[in-house]
């Protein structure tokens, strides 16, 4: 099985909260797609609650689009990581990490301004696969923690696992 880019970096050295450019690729038409690792919690140390991350999934995707989309950037998707330590964001364009961090901060402030669980978009059985698994309170606690901690930048060069270690860890 091919080794995915996200598994070539040392998760034990990742800072959180932090932004990292996980991958860049070119489309056949020449557009650049950038995938960002938006790490909310330190891997293997903390985990986002099920209800909190699910509620953030509904809120964060819209708020990030409000703050980041523009003439040179269009968000394709923001999805929670299976490990529940953050989100992956794929977009067309190449915004710098600090621009993404600023949009993330503004989005967390927006989460804190949501007044009622009934204001969570697509919170119904027709548009959500587990519409009863939400907590605005838990989402706000996550947002508060992000704002209190601030957002750093993780660089792939600083986190790259040595080739020898990748071979040693490989499951054939």
Swiss-Prot record:
Supply one GO molecular-function term. S-ribosylhomocysteine lyase activity
Please give a single GO biological process term from the UniProt record: quorum sensing
Q: Which residues are involved in binding Fe cation? A: 54, 58, 128
> Subunit structure of this entry?
Homodimer.
Cited PANTHER family: S-RIBOSYLHOMOCYSTEINE LYASE
Record text on cofactor binding: Binds 1 Fe cation per subunit.
Similarity field: Belongs to the LuxS family.
Pfam families given for it?
LuxS
Alphabetic keyword roster: Autoinducer synthesis, Iron, Lyase, Metal-binding, Quorum sensing
Catalysed reaction, written as an equation:
S-(5-deoxy-D-ribos-5-yl)-L-homocysteine = (S)-4,5-dihydroxypentane-2,3-dione + L-homocysteine
Function noted in UniProt: Involved in the synthesis of autoinducer 2 (AI-2) which is secreted by bacteria and is used to communicate both the cell density and the metabolic potential of the environment. The regulation of gene expression in response to changes in cell density is called quorum sensing. Catalyzes the transformation of S-ribosylhomocysteine (RHC) to homocysteine (HC) and 4,5-dihydroxy-2,3-pentadione (DPD).
**NCBIfam families from the entry?**
PRK02260.1-2
Q: Does the keyword Lyase apply?
A: yes
EC number from the UniProt entry: 4.4.1.21
Which cofactors is this protein said to need? Fe cation
Top-level EC class, please?
Answer: lyase
Q: What is this protein called?
A: S-ribosylhomocysteine lyase
